[in-house]
C-alpha cells in the first residue's frame, strides 16, 4: 500500500516521526520515534503502544496499555525542528478490541461526523473557528501557599506610555479596546503574525486573513479556511502549535486563555458551521437572513442546549470572566443577522453556498474536538425535534431594559454552573453513542477539580478588599 508518510520521509530525508494526540483537556501530547520504524507498512496497522494511565481522565494503572494509531492523511513536515521531522496525528485505540477509545476526543469527533450521516440530515458538516490570542513579551505568575501573583510585560500595552524602554518609548500603541485595527506602528504584531501565517501555510492550512484584535497588549487573530469537523479540529491544534512556536522563536509568548487582562476584551473562538447534503448547503433558504428551516432548527438546538454546551465550549474558570456584558462577548442565548451582541450570528454572505451560522460564545480554551462535536449534536437535536429559536433579536442586547433581558436565556455564569448543566442536560450528546456517559462523568470530575481549586484558592484581590477588616 502507498502511504503519504513514506513518500515524505524519502523525499525529505526525514529522521524522526512525531506522533501526536489530544488529551481530554485539549492539550496536544506527543512521542517521537525514528523515521525508519515508520517505513514498515505494519506501523499503520499496529500503531505504537503507550501508557494511557499517565493521561488525566483516561485509564487506571491496572489497564493502562493503549495504542497510538497514526492517520497517514495528516502527515506533514514540522517547520520548527532542527532535524527533519514528520508529524502524524493519531487516534487512540483500545488494544483489547482494536476499536477507537471512547474517551479519545478525536474519536468522539469522528463519531459525531458518522452520527450526522446516520441521521440522513446531511453528509458533511463544515466548521470555521476563529481562535483569538494574545502575544506578550513576557509573563510571570505563581500560586502557592506563600502567595499568588501574575504580571504581564508588553511593550505595546496601553499602560506603558510612560515606561522606560531600552530602545526608546516611541509612543505608538493601541489603547484599551483600541486595537481593531490600526496600521503599524500602532499594530506592533504585523510581522510576527505574517511569520505565523507563513508557518501555517507551510503546514497545509489555508490562511484567509490576519489582523490585530480589539484589546491592547497584543490581541491577535489569524483566520484560516473552513474544513470538515475532524480535519478542522486537527487544524486548530496545528494553529496553536505554530503560533506558540513562532512566538517562542521571536522571544515572545502566546496565550489562548480567554481573559488574561482585566478591563479589556477577552479572546473568543467564534465557530462558523453549516451542513451539506449531496453537495448542497442545507442552511440556505428563503427564511430569515436567507436561512432554511433546517438552519433555524439547528440554531434552536444550540440555544436550547447552550448552558450544557458551555461545559465543552467554555471549559475554564477563566472563560466566565470573558462572558460578561461590555466586552463584545455574547451572554444572551439569542440569534440575529449581523448583530454581534447575540450568541448566534448569521454573517452576511454574497452567495447561498456560503450561508452559515456563527456561534459566538465558545472560547479557545475549548478542546476543539469536543466543542465542535457538542455544537453539532446540539444543532442536530434541534433539527430532529424541530426546535424553533423564536424571533430574531435585532437590537443591541447589552442595552435591553431589565424586564426584557430577563426573558432571554443566558449562558452560564461560572464553570460550576456549566458542569452542572452538562450533567443534567447530556441526553442530546449521548445519541448514537457519540459521547458516552462514562466519558461525560470523567470529564465533569476532571474539570470540577479545577473549579474547586480556583474557588478555594486565596485570591490577591481578597487582600485588597478584606485585609484591613
Swiss-Prot record:
Disulfide bonds: none annotated. Its EC number is 6.3.1.2. Keywords: ATP-binding, Cytoplasm, Ligase, Magnesium, Metal-binding, Nucleotide-binding, Phosphoprotein. It is found in: Cytoplasm. L-glutamate binds at residues 265-266, 322, 328, 340, 360. ATP binds at residues 208, 272-274, 340, 345, 353. Residues 105-469 form the GS catalytic domain. It catalyses: L-glutamate + NH4(+) + ATP = L-glutamine + ADP + phosphate + H(+). Coiled coil: none annotated. Residues 12-97 form the GS beta-grasp domain. Its main location: cytoplasm. Signal peptide: none annotated. PROSITE patterns: GLNA_1, GLNA_ADENYLATION, GLNA_ATP, GS_BETA_GRASP, GS_CATALYTIC. Catalyzes the ATP-dependent biosynthesis of glutamine from glutamate and ammonia. This is Glutamine synthetase. It comes from Pseudomonas aeruginosa (strain ATCC 15692 / DSM 22644 / CIP 104116 / JCM 14847 / LMG 12228 / 1C / PRS 101 / PAO1).
